Amino acid sequence: MRIMAVRLVAGAITLALMAYAWLAWERARDPEPITILERVLERGELRVITRISATTYYQTDKGRAGLEFELAQAFAHRLGVQLRMLVAPDLEAIFAALDDGEADLAAAGLTYTESRGQRYWFTPPYKDITQQLVYRVGTPRPDDLSEIGPGELAVIANSSHADRLRELRNRSHPDLTWAEDEHADSEAMLYRVWNEELRYTVADSHELSINRAYYPELRKAFEISGVEGLAWAFPRTEDLSLYNEAARYFTDLRLEGTLSTLLEEHFGHLGRFDYVGFRAFNRHVADRLPRYRHWFEEAAEEYGVDWRLLAAIGYQESHWDPQAVSPTGVRGIMMLTLDTASMLGVDNRLDPKQSIFGGARYFSRLLERLPEDIEEPHRAWMALAAYNVGYGHLQDARRLARQRGYDPNDWRVIRDHLPLLSQRQWYVQTRHGYARGWEPVHYVRNIRLYYQLLQRITEPGRRQVPAGEALGEPPLPTPPAPPGAPLPADPPAD
């Protein structure tokens, strides 16, 4: 009996071992399929297809930049893998890369449309935009699509704009015609309208806002869509592992406030547009900036600041006019007060080199003076506000924000609190009293815009149009200073 029991146990063990070996062999022969997310992690690389534009991805002298790049870089970091950005020449190539498996996702300022949604998965949108019909000042402004004649309208092929026009033609404008360019990008289409090679095009609202800074005559005629969302696109497969991770990523970005910070950094300074001001800026880039650029660069290197930011400050202060004088007595390119100039060791505020180096030194001191827990880019914007309104008033606004339960290290919060310094119910609570708090808000916004323009103008490899040529005007000559000519000096202090 005992022998039989032993034999039964031995047989059971043998059968179990045989079954285990058979299962192991089957698993080795036909392993479980690896998910897309697991494949990315195993590869150690996230492949992202994009396009080059001011709103997506581009190169600067400091490396890669653009909203889509920053979003993709943070997502790759979250996954613990390296980021590989693939650049497509057009929209067709972007979608082909998804279809062929060459890219894991597309981050290219893509709008969700019904037709695209049938072929690809789209994440929750990260930015709202509208589609706008664009024309140039001096050409007829249409009030409706029915006023657009044959040969007057062109858009990018395979774009959401083309999809929207087809929808509108089928619904209410059967006679509407347009051309589709398979090789152009949004900036090229806007340039063609500005250069009067094309009467009309369609652009997303944020792209028009940025490009109007380069081509001030461009205008929105009307919107052809309601609010739409920009999102990432993924191949429409049954495996949603990577897509779900990206969807959670965007949800977390929104909840943490990181997404709004990024959008503010890239688009928060585009709220207002000054047509005359941008024409003047483009003209001064050609005729004034070359005289002083080397001093901006030298001062920037000495004080660890981007020279284009210093130049943007100088333009906001004086339009790069070394003889500038305000009614309050501030003088020179960087518009230094007499007291500030004395503190900085500037003997002659009308000497452009002394003024530029003095302004750089002052801005650098403000950056260093701010509390260490203020991070970039908030730190730079607050230092700019202090440059304009004074460090004490900036700190008053930060204290008010803290008292009211807001984050005093967030520029968006301080931007909303600075104007309170002009209202008695608030400034009586501060150490430094009344200030025209709306002025530093406009001041910072303008400098951010000039800074972005200078970054784009000086971008490596960018196809540049000389400012005078871009405005349809000959660039003004730069008159040389007579050898040894003395610079005008500050008048003696009272």
Swiss-Prot record:
Q: Which UniProt keywords apply?
A: Cell outer membrane, Cell wall biogenesis/degradation, Lyase, Membrane, Signal
Compositionally biased region (Pro residues):
474-494
Q: Where is this region: LT domain?
A: 271-494
Entry's Pfam families? SBP_bac_3, SLT
- Establish whether keyword Cell wall biogenesis/degradation is in the entry: yes
Q: What class of enzyme is it?
A: lyase
Q: Where in the cell is it found?
A: Cell outer membrane
Q: What is this protein called?
A: Membrane-bound lytic murein transglycosylase F 1
Q: What is the lineage of its organism?
A: Bacteria, Pseudomonadati, Pseudomonadota, Gammaproteobacteria, Chromatiales
